[in-house]
Amino acid sequence: MTNAKTAKFAWNEENTQKAVSMYQQLINENGLDFANSDGLKEIAKAVGAASPVSVRSKLTSAKAYQKSDKPRKVGGGSSIRKAHYVRVIAKHAIDSGIIKDADDLASLESAKLETLDAVAQLLGVADEVKQAAGE
């Protein structure tokens, strides 16, 4: 067993320039989405950086990082929110003359999502809720 310590990685002009040029080359060859995901991993390995996050941070401070145009979906959950259910149910209640204002049903947002889904299915508006949520 040896007590030799490995040198910690530190950004300098040389490895910063290498990271920037590799990043730009990856964008040209493989596109922005690849460069911003697997490309950052490749750059981290090539320059010896601790992580792709470190590379992204350095590219950002060097004003070389390009943010992707399309939004990423984070998490695996549904994009349907309680507000979508309440809006659609309230719209139908107003159209039917049952209530005058959507605020009359605002307290429905405190119900569980599964409960609102069951009510929407019962009322036959579940597909409309999905459309309102953009699914």
Curated annotation (Swiss-Prot):
Upregulating conditions: Expressed pre-early in the viral replicative cycle. Expressed with a few other proteins from the first step transfer (FST) DNA. FST DNA corresponds to the first small portion of the genome that enters into the host cell at the beginning of infection before pausing.
Entry keyword set: DNA-binding, Early protein
Claim: Cytoplasm is one of the keywords in the record: no
GO molecular function annotations of the record: DNA binding
Additional remark text: This gene is part of the long terminal repeats present at both ends of the viral genome and is thus duplicated.
Function summary: Involved, together with A1 protein, in the second step transfer (SST) which allows the completion of viral DNA into the host cell.
The protein's name: Protein A2
Species name: Escherichia phage T5 (Enterobacteria phage T5)
Gene assigned in the entry: A2
